[in-house]
């Protein structure tokens, strides 16, 4: 894949953590030769997911800290909310505002949205392409 790719927090978690080997390999293949973009919200969502994983003892504190460092170092262009506020509001009945921000960004940039959220990808109100892991 080449070009621009919108990445959501679920995708970034897979990219940065050692989930299943096949899914991690898929995520690394997807980002090859792409410019990653996301809403400004994404690093906060990933940080929250890391915190929850640590609290549930799915990762050690050391693993969480290293993953957080990788998140901070990840080369992702972050976009502010204001240019997408109207579309996020328009999608409010179909999905959460968090998901809507990713969708609105992908729609505006005419870029695929990489996610592991298959339910989001099935939402009828979206006008973007989704990149999902193999089943």
Label every model-predicted segment.
Residues 1-4, 39, 91, 103-135:
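Acidic, PIN/NYN-like endoribonuclease modules and their adjacent C-terminal/linker elements
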Residues 11-12, 42, 84, 102, ...:
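Alpha-helix capping/helix-boundary segments
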Residues 1-41, 53-62:
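Short, well-structured N-terminal submotif of metal-dependent ribonuclease cores
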Residues 14-16, 49, 123-124:
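Residues that scaffold the ATP/ADP-binding catalytic core of kinase and kinase-like folds
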Residues 8, 99, 117:
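Acidic active-site catalytic centers that drive phospho-/nucleotidyl reactions
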Residues 40-43, 63-93:
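Acidic catalytic patch
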């Amino acid at each position: 894949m080449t070009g621009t790719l919108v990445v959501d927090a679920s995708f970034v978690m897979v990219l940065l953590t050692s989930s299943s080997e096949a899914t991690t390999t898929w995520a690394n293949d997807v980002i090859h030769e792409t410019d990653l973009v996301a809403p400004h919200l994404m690093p906060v969502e990933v940080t929250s997911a890391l915190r929850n994983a640590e609290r549930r003892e799915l990762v050690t504190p050391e693993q969480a800290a290293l993953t957080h460092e990788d998140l901070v170092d990840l080369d992702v262009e972050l976009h502010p909310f204001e240019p997408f506020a109207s579309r996020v509001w328009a999608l409010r009945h179909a999905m959460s505002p968090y998901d809507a921000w990713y969708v609105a960004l992908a729609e505006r940039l005419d870029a695929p949205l990489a996610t592991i959220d298959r339910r989001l990808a099935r939402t009828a109100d979206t006008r973007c392409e989704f990149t999902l892991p193999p089943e």
